């Protein structure tokens, strides 16, 4: 019974990223075995045969000897200690050679048919010279290349490798790369080999979409949107090309016109013709007007107004208006009661061709809690804006509305927040700006704020006129109040001086009847 020890180099012994390898036995299955060379010579108890193990772990390592010596021993009953001693010695020798090479790379092993066939045909008596050995190792390096990224392993196994330098278009290269990635994933599904070349594989190769699995609804919508965009661009490009071609055709037709015709047209200018009208139309118009005048006698002004209102009403059916209308009935203007009723369906009706259809979804338009808000995006305050803020603060005080006019991109809320922030950070400077007042330059303020202010003299004249008018109205009001007070006082005096009705008694004698009391 024979066994083979598979040794692989490791990184530093204390590194926690070093991959771990364990010895395993070869399984007899349909899979291809690891390449090794054997000599068909009988073994005795004291003889040990050395073989060349060709593996990916040592194909690209920078070692002086390209072949690592391993031991294939046979369990012999005669001298078991010698075989175990030779095995341990060879393992130690391999470890020394491999630890001396710091530039080692880990990759996924691959087994090919061509090097197997080349090795199987070697006879036991074959002697590899130095040149033959170099040629043989070049062929092995060609098939056992470690510097292959993960996304191209399937291409290497097939013996094909696409690259951007080929004559294929970019589109075909992209499709072939996607196929390679999907094939790689399909090949590795359910297998135990999950080793990745960490020195060569990029994160983008692992994050790329291999195009395997069921498409989601979001992916389908994105594909549809991209297709519509490409289609619109293509139609626009075709329209521009057709317009340019038609323009070129028109220019060619104008250039190809005979020169003589153009000269004749230029030499004989055409007279401008005015179309006044045709005799038939004039005759028909005159006959129609005569028939109308004979059939309908001259209408009154009210009847003509009623006809005009009816025509306007028919024309305004499309443009619905909720204003009340009037009509003429028996020579009188009467309010149309039907116009007082408002039909909301007719009012809100919009023709189909004038409607604007807007399709909104989460892909084309993101709707969040801040979508319908009016909050402006805050901007950072630099040193220049801060100095400008302190200058405005010393001019206008804490009137943040006037200060906000000096900053077109900011509102009153942002100015107030800036004031609170500066009051916490630098209260001494804020107090100094509020105590020391600076003169106000209206020209600079109007230039910065974009508002036009009239001169102060005109404003003072207007204020003086307003004051005079106010004083005059006040004087008139006082005079009117005094007159009213005089009238009230006069009435009170008359009431006081008038005799009381209870003191005087009137007597009326009618037919011997005496009436005592006041006669009303």
From Swiss-Prot:
Family per record: Belongs to the TFC5 family.
Quaternary structure and partners: TFIIIB comprises the TATA-binding protein (tbp1), the B-related factor (brf1) and the B'' component (bdp1).
Chain intervals with Basic and acidic residues compositional bias: 23-40, 85-94
Compositionally biased tracts (Acidic residues): 279-289
One GO CC term, this protein: transcription factor TFIIIB complex
GO biological process: RNA polymerase III preinitiation complex assembly
Positions of disulphide bridges: none
Pfam families: Myb_DNA-bind_7
Region (Disordered): 1-94, 155-177, 233-297
Stored SMART domains: SANT (SM00717)
The protein, known as: Transcription factor TFIIIB component B''
Name of the gene encoding the protein in the UniProt record: bdp1
Stretches that traverse the bilayer: none
Alphabetized UniProt keyword annotations: Activator, Nucleus, Transcription, Transcription regulation
Functional note: General activator of RNA polymerase III transcription.
Regions of compositional bias (Polar residues) in chain numbering: 1-12, 41-68, 239-257
Domain annotation SANT: ranges: 376-427
Subcellular location per the Swiss-Prot or TrEMBL entry: Nucleus
Organism phylogeny: Eukaryota, Fungi, Dikarya, Ascomycota, Taphrinomycotina
GO molecular-function terms, A-Z: DNA binding; RNA polymerase III general transcription initiation factor activity; TFIIIC-class transcription factor complex binding
Species assigned in the record: Schizosaccharomyces pombe (strain 972 / ATCC 24843)
